[in-house]
Amino acid sequence: MTSILTNVAAMAALQTLRGIDSNMEETQARVSSGLRVGTASDNAAYWSIATTMRSDNMALSAVQDALGLGAAKVDTAYAGMENAVEVVKEIRAKLVAATEDGVDKAKIQEEIEQLKQQLTSIATAASFSGENWLQADLTAPVTKSVVGSFVRDSSGVVSVKTIDYVLDGNSVLFDTVGNNGILDKVYDVSESSVTLSINTGGVVSEHTVAAYTVDDLIAGGAVFQGNYALAGGVNYVKVEGVWVEAVASSGAPGQEVAAVTTAAAPITADSWAVDTTAGPAASVPAPASIENIDITNAAQAANLDALIRGVDEALEDLISATSALGSISMRIGMQEEFVSKLTDSIDSGIGRLVDADMNEESTRLKALQTQQQLAIQSLSIANTNSENILQLFRQ
């Protein structure tokens, strides 16, 4: 039926044109944004996943920056520690040279002093962004952390993982408060036994007694009171920095050190004692730290072998600490590479979920433009129906 009031053909053409225009708007939005899921209304599930993963990627980007900062700190400490190893090697070489008869120990000590100052300079300068891992207050171990990763578990709980490095007596060159660093702590290199001159009732005789380091006694439960101590039921006295087992009682005058039979008993004439006025018959190695090496000192000059062993122990600690820093540096480098690849993988995964296929969208846009032109022509034709009816009345 033909009607001048209702143009059904025009209405159908207009409805088709509106649908095409709507599809064109969506396609143009995808082409311009590059996304097929740009809002939650496009696909709520994919949009939610993509938004969460983009947030995680931002956190991983921050982790990458933190890893770079951490790597700089570790590399700075490693460079300082590596240099310190070489300096301590030089000190050991100087001590070995000092064992030669006829050498000028004072001149060698001058060189050692310069090397010791270089160690101090290294420890002070090895700082990055206010962080110095080569000198610290070792009242208690200090844990330094480098951000390593950002993790979201299966339940959606997020956490930041760190790479830790402990600053203690085995990893720090100098203790800023006490003497517990590698270079300022005392390395006990005492022999297992020492021969002493013992004055018993005015009769001097030699006795070989057990020698102990301070650490050994502490481990045995010793409680030190002045220059004598009791550990495990055995009495000890301190002779030139080394604790030895007391073996004889004496009422002779001039006794410099003594150990009592019990921790609570007072020192009396009947106490166990060692007379050190004459000195030991065999030399007692004097423990020393690298910081306090002075071969012009008679006690140290007489025990160069012990000093060399002490320096060698410190060198082993330095090498171990340097190795630990190198391992952490390697791990940080690996983590940086992993985080970079992980970020790329997440970006790729997000793209698969929400990115538009530009070839497909471009083809669809061309098709819709053609459909739009045809729909416009169809609407134009439908609108001419009323004119055709008027032509009938004109005839």
From Swiss-Prot:
Location in the cell: Secreted; Bacterial flagellum
Under Gene3D superfamilies, the record lists: f41 fragment of flagellin, N-terminal domain (1.20.1330.10)
**SUPFAM superfamilies named among the record's database cross-references:** Phase 1 flagellin (SSF64518)
Output the Gene Ontology cellular-component terms. Answer: bacterial-type flagellum; extracellular region
Entry keyword set = Bacterial flagellum, Secreted
InterPro entries registered for this protein in UniProt: Flagellin, Flagellin_C, Flagellin_N
Q: Which residues form a coiled coil?
A: none
GO MF, one annotated term: structural molecule activity
Where primarily located? Answer: secreted
What job does this protein perform?
Flagellin is the subunit protein which polymerizes to form the filaments of bacterial flagella.
Protein family membership: Belongs to the bacterial flagellin family.
Q: Which PANTHER family match?
A: FLAGELLIN (PTHR42792:SF2)
Question: What protein name does the entry list?
Answer: Flagellin D
Q: Which organism is it from?
A: Rhizobium meliloti (Ensifer meliloti)
